[in-house]
């Protein structure tokens, strides 16, 4: 492990166009449940009788707007979550002009909360909301502080600005993400299984020098990586910062 940390530190220190790609594992340490792993949010809400995929779908929003709104308020508004050391480390490297930014599969908005400026949120963010009817914009604090569920302009359902099942990923976000990956000298993957498509397929466009994967479990890209660390990323980053 120590040799891996030394290699990681050397690569990070010698890179000046790092792109980060993050998944659910990064946010677990902040108290955000992993949507897919055992014991995660998907397992918890599937006990309610409807599939998690349906509860997070465009169909559910259209079939039962009230049910969808109530589900979002009950299950998705992570009020007390704060960035952890991994989010802070990524933001610091961007401030130091070593990083092109971060691409994330997460919807919790914690990268922005940590101070990262160049964040591409592939699946949207819970930091923004909008009316499903008239598209008036709302902030997360608007929704939480006022327990706001319906638009004060037209009465429509206020939904989070996330990509639901049955919706397309935002193409400008995909293009920016591809640009980050194609121009990176080092790509650091953190806390992602790299199996959820099409987001994970973006990794195949990396042509730089160093692909680093830090994840508890194996990924389909491990064999192509310069360095693979199967460990808890919070522990890895803490150790790295004390090297």
Curated annotation (Swiss-Prot):
This is NAD-dependent protein deacetylase. It is an enzyme of class 2 (transferase). The active site is at 123 (proton acceptor). GO terms for molecular function: histone deacetylase activity, NAD-dependent; NAD+ binding; zinc ion binding. CDD domains: SIR2H (cd01411). Its cofactor is Zn(2+). Nicotinamide binds at residues 35, 107-108. NAD-dependent protein deacetylase which modulates the activities of several enzymes which are inactive in their acetylated form. It is found in: Cytoplasm. One of its GO terms (cellular component) is cytoplasm. NCBIfam families: PRK00481.1-1. Pfam families: SIR2. Keywords: Cytoplasm, Metal-binding, NAD, Transferase, Zinc. NAD(+) binds at residues 24, 35-36, 105, 107-108, 123, 192-193, 215, 232. Signal peptide: none annotated.
